[in-house]
Amino acid sequence: MLDKPIILDPCNPVFNSEEAGIFTDFEVTQTIQSIGKLVIDHSLQYVQAIEKRLKEGQKDSKTTSQKLASQFGITNQSEVKELTELAIVRTAREYAHANSSVLERYLSIVNLYKNQVRLNHRTSESIMLQQYSTPAPIAFLMGIWCGIDDPNKQGFEPSAGNGLLTIVAAPRQFIVNEISELRYKNLLTQGFKLVTKNDASLKMPAYERSFDAVISNPPFGLLPQRVNVGPIRVHKLDHLMALYALETMKPAGKAAFILGGHTHYNAQGLIAGRNRGNHAVGDRFFFNYLHHHYNVVDVISIDGELYARQGTQFDVRVVLVDGVKKEPSGFAPIAEEVNQTVVDTFEALYE
């Protein structure tokens, strides 16, 4: 995730905090540690309670979730939302690893998604970081396509949230990165190979061409200023983070990531540089660069309604990449060569 301002929000206090002080008294330190453990225990108890309700098929609302959380001493709405999503991640991972067919596992996760509470609580931080997690059914299919159900595959998620995009894999297979403090703490509880808190809008040379699979749902939004990537200038955050994430994929690796909006074409059939509202979106340069350097298998347009329970109804695209081209060549296909169908049901997405 991003740790510097973007146009969407002028200020985010989470990045301006300092330690209030250091305790040196042993008894005070022990008391603080005990309180911290108690808070963690209460958080886990709430997560387990939500998991139980999800598995029983009970549908909760924002109100019932907050009421249940208050029974465990959890009253902060942001914490309730993130812990609720952690329960969804844990349950979805269990379903993803069931001893059944891919279709059966997928349908169980679709049912889970339909029963989950709408995660529509918003804060200045979540708005600035554009924190809309991936619906579990989409996350499952992206993981299956990337092959992370193979225990020998090593993966990377640079904007991991609470870990939804990793549910097909065992946590030990993944290095995950997240800048949000609440989500970072939730990731630490899941047994990942490594959890980091870095700015994923910057290059990651330590991970260059390191992973069998890269999977990500980067935040959407405009950068404060355009960034040069090779011959193109990128001004959308999700475009930039996707390109940098792809640099960590092995030459024969696979990647799946989500971009905001749908692709539009001009009268000549070329990808339009502006959307229907005449706003510059940078799609033409981005996709030409992507197709020139990578084997792009598909770009699937998804109706925003499928995102409703994640707190938004923003149209998105799932981009599937199968390796790096040995020699850069080609450009994005023209309109008549592309399936522009917008997927609006989970059944159609599976097909």
Annotate the PLM regions.
Residues 303-351:
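Flexible, glycine-/basic-rich loop-and-beta segments that form/coincide
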Residues 186, 203-206, 290, 310:
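A general structural signal for stabilizing positions within well-ordered secondary structure
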Residues 139-149, 153-169, 180, 197-229, ...:
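Conserved proline-anchored active-site loop of SAM-dependent methyltransferases
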